């Protein structure tokens, strides 16, 4: 979600072009795939490469029937594309701007300095694809801030400010999310302000 957030903060998109933080929504993203012609995805991907390696996968590079998951999420992106294909739908164009993370199992963890240092390049790679598809991007005016893609507490700076230090942080996820009882609804902190 950090690359999508950085992209959203840097560029305004025209009507009909949505920027969203898909996070780890898995199957919930199927409707998004089924309602779009072209899709640009930013994600960490296990390319089996050196950490920090940036790659762009285009439609023909993504093997939807592959059993190899390129994403650490429960329902992989390949699974979603396969589900769309079963329903008779195929994206016109697809580009995945992926980066090889240092750790794949640091759920809820911070971006490492190496990965953070590659965000600008990832954003520009994504912008290049959108422009090739005919999307006119407008840089946001200096000093303006885009509305959050999700709850503001999940934006990079606010999230990091609330994250426990390394001695207290659960390395298998962020305990702020793990302590919920199954079936317990997550309150929207924006509604309590």
For the regions a language model picked out, list residue spans one by one.
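Short "lid" loop at the C-terminus of a central beta-strand within the Rossmann-like core
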Residues: 102
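N-terminal catalytic or cofactor-binding beta/alpha core of small enzyme domains
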Residues: 1-90, 96-99, 109, 113-117, ...
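Hydrophobic "lid"/C-terminal helical patch
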Residues: 126
């Amino acid at each position: 979600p950090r690359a999508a957030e950085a992209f959203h903060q840097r560029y305004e998109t025209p009507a009909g072009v949505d920027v969203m933080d898909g996070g780890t929504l898995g199957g919930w993203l199927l409707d998004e795939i089924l309602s779009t012609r072209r899709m640009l995805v930013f994600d960490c991907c296990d390319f089996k490469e050196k950490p920090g390696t940036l790659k762009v996968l285009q439609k023909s590079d993504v093997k939807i029937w592959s059993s190899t998951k390129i994403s650490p999420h429960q329902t992989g992106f390949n699974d979603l594309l396969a589900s769309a294909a079963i329903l008779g739908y195929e994206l016109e164009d697809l580009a995945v701007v992926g980066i090889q993370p240092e750790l794949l199992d640091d759920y809820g963890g911070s971006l490492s300095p190496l990965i953070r240092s590659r965000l600008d390049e990832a954003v520009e790679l994504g912008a290049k694809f959108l422009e090739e598809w005919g999307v006119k991007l407008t840089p946001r005016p200096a000093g303006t801030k885009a509305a959050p893609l999700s709850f503001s507490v999940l934006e990079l700076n606010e999230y990091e400010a609330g994250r426990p230090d390394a001695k207290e942080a659960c390395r298998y996820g962020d305990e702020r999310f793990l302590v919920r009882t199954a079936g317990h609804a997550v309150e929207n902190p924006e509604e309590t302000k």
